[in-house]
Amino acid sequence: MLHYRESKPNQQKTIVFLHAAGFDGRIWKQAAEQLDDFHCVCPDLPGHGQSKAIQVTDFDAASDAVAELIGSLGGDPVCLAGLSMGSYIGFRLLARHPHLVEGAVFSGFQHKPIEVSGVMRALMHASSFMMNSRKNREKMARSLGVNDPSLVSQRGGRPNASSKTMRKISSLALDFDVSNDLQAIETRTLVLAGETEHPAILSSLPAFQSGMPQCTARIVPGLGHGWIATEPDLYAETLRAWFLQNPLPEGLNAVTAD
């Protein structure tokens, strides 16, 4: 089963946090501290951290691993929060195990494949090896607003995920296609993106909002893929509002129809 960290296990509602590629469950430490009125569960996803031995094959299998963890917690359906890779996995969890989740907040993913050239795929493939360098990993983390260098490495300086795992996840993300699955997702879901996100992610917001029966989409003005790290207070406020079914923060912009 996936390794996980948890806090405040006696709280009534549980949030399961799903991290981005190249990180592990430690990335959610600040969010868990700010959301101390929730039971927060922060797993290391397949191929990452202390779950590195669980191979990444596809996002469906990864979602099944998260479902196994949620089932082991017992109790009521959980709230789900995902960033980037965690959002892809989280969406597949809603599709495959909807009974386990009462509400979800996802950021930084798209609903259909991103068209890239063979040359670009080759460059992305090559860049995965650069993440073997601790210096490069820390530079990448800082570009996302993550200032704690320890979060990109395990003890001894090893990366949280192998270059092979990073290549696999990159390929799965580029090819992700749930355009025909949106209508079937009935879980109450909030989909977010920074205003300077990749165009494919921004253009997916109206599709999520119109295609999923209980979906709301919002844009975080002036920020990009790593907005959760640069605006942790806004993120925590957003999660609390959505999961308690209160009005969303005014700092989020509405998404117009496609």
Predicted segments, located by residue:
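Flexible "cap/lid" loop of the alpha/beta hydrolase fold
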Residues: 91-96, 101-131
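Alpha/beta-hydrolase fold catalytic core
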Residues: 1-16, 36-39, 74-76, 160, ...
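Gly/Ala-rich beta-loop-alpha elbow adjacent to hydrolase catalytic centers
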Residues: 82-86, 90
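Short beta-strand/loop motif that positions the catalytic acidic residue
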Residues: 185, 191-193
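Conserved HGGG/HGGXW glycine-rich cap/lid loop of the alpha/beta-hydrolase fold
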Residues: 6-52
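Active-site loop/oxyanion-hole signature of alpha/beta-hydrolase fold enzymes
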Residues: 29-30, 39-81, 237
